[in-house]
């Protein structure tokens, strides 16, 4: 009931706030001067972008001022604006609130560790945040004369002050609560509206389902092979699976178990139970009431008896497998839709092995999770929520095994590296070590970082007696979450080598080898610089000057490396236009294609780890050659993806993204995304289906209709979610097509049922929901089709009477 109340309340809040937010954003941009003022506001992308930058910073400040981090004043910004306006009224030579106050607050205050007495006299006591959010922005570097009129802030703060800003998810009756979850929806909606690129707001149930069924199976696989001791625990008769065998129904979701008891057959009404026997005669007559609505306590919302019986029988089947010890693979948790998060938590709590606890913690510290089209960070946010409790539970147990040298080293690192509290340290570790995202839209990446930072600040309370008000600096993740084109650029060293393999003579061959060696050395240097940059953030005694120098060095080296690779890619794809025309044509190509060189940006992952461990997301559903209805321009007219894409004939960006992800993922990685159902059904997507059959391993596909309810609110789109392993098991598990009502949304993903389906029966990836449907398909495929009995031409006459 509380969850439903929050859902209903937050839905109304998000719609109301978003409507006002859009108006405020449009109005705010009009007050900005000094950014391409000659361009009309509608087409002035940089001015619109800077309006977003400012609103993001100010919303972050609204959250932290309500927690007391801005001089202990919950109305800090509004009061400082009033002071500036009053002073300006008395002295016309005073500059605007933006120039006189905000720019200094951001650069010398929130982005600087030391504040002198003169600063504190004007600004009060505020924390050093770091995080990159208050660094000088690219637009601020490009445009030196930016100013914003005071009226922009008067209107904006009046709008913000109508709402209650807090960093938890409390439910109140005010209908005015703004928290990071609500803001996440608003950001997603805003980015999607701005991008007009076939992206939709992905709700938490989708991101959580995909996240838990990729991240946790990967962690289990890594832990199982971490040491001989732990490997024994994961053997079929080992401690891990014996724990599951003795667990009863603990790991079945409550929604699946609704109304289930071992003797449910005796408890259901007799006129329903009479239809259970499939061998006795008159089956249809005995099941006459199976289409009636199921009453409590057996029913889920909208369920009829036929559906209830199928669910209860499925519980019987799963329970039999658990108690017989037949489930001995982490992938079975996906197949039978068991609560793998609870299972992982229980194993950590119950294990008496220091090796198991340490290796679980070590796997958590090292897993790399990527969203290649991250938008405003919905999937990264879900990944953090999945990882955080496991981090905490492992750390809570480590102290019991501190005699183990590896455990002691891990504890020393933890004890040295956090001041605020353990949860803050965990979030910081996750954001720096585990999460990576790329998006073509710079605004989206900035919002993704903001959402992650808000999650961190939420777990810290202000402490006026402590240094920096008790707040550790936020992590700078400018090199974790990047802006660029996922589809264009060098993914790995193999792609660079392919472009260097077409030498015309021995001199060209030698030059190519020299280029390759130089690039390899530069990439290693960038990776080493990145490791040092990250290390400085994870140590407690972070030195500001040293940190800033490390960041500048990393950025400069990366810029140089990217420029070198982009020039090589431009020549490889467009040819060499000659010295005179090269630079203007190269810059034009650079501006339209925004190449992202994965092997340079994430060398330590692509080269050192063989790719990312987990890739999740919701790629854009956009036709490559289809013209946008609003702009009249097709993607292929803006940039061209390489001809090497095998999925190019599908002509859709989501197919290209999946193919790209298959290259970026490690040989033992997990891949999960939500995409249109057409991916597995249409002739136009055969190349993508071939990729699933030939290059991905064991796969689970669940499918959802657009009526009566939709996964993306208000969007009539039939969708599929796939989870794939990178292995040699070409097994496909599918569900039927789920048609569901909105009141069933809370139970939808907990009630999925998969069936193993042969995929050699037809070219497409067929979707079946039970063994009966599999049998029908097999019979259909094994018999001679009617078409073989039909002749294209015959000698018989046909007479027709009019």
Language-model-derived ranges and their functions:
Residues 364-367, 432, 652, 719:
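Short coil/loop residues immediately preceding or within conserved phosphate-binding loops
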Residues 389-393:
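Post-Walker A helix-loop "phosphate-sensing" segment adjacent to the P-loop in P-loop NTPases
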Residues 234-247, 406-410, 690-691, 697:
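Long amphipathic alpha-helical scaffold regions
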Residues 1-386, 434-444, 484-487, 566-627, ...:
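Preference for the N-terminal adenyl/adenosyl cofactor-binding alpha/beta module
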Residues 1-134, 202, 381, 388, ...:
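Signature of N6-adenine DNA methyltransferases within the class I
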Residues 21, 213, 281-357, 402, ...:
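SAM-dependent nucleic-acid methyltransferase catalytic core
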Residues 69-71, 197, 221-226, 394-398, ...:
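Short, flexible/disordered secondary-structure transition segments
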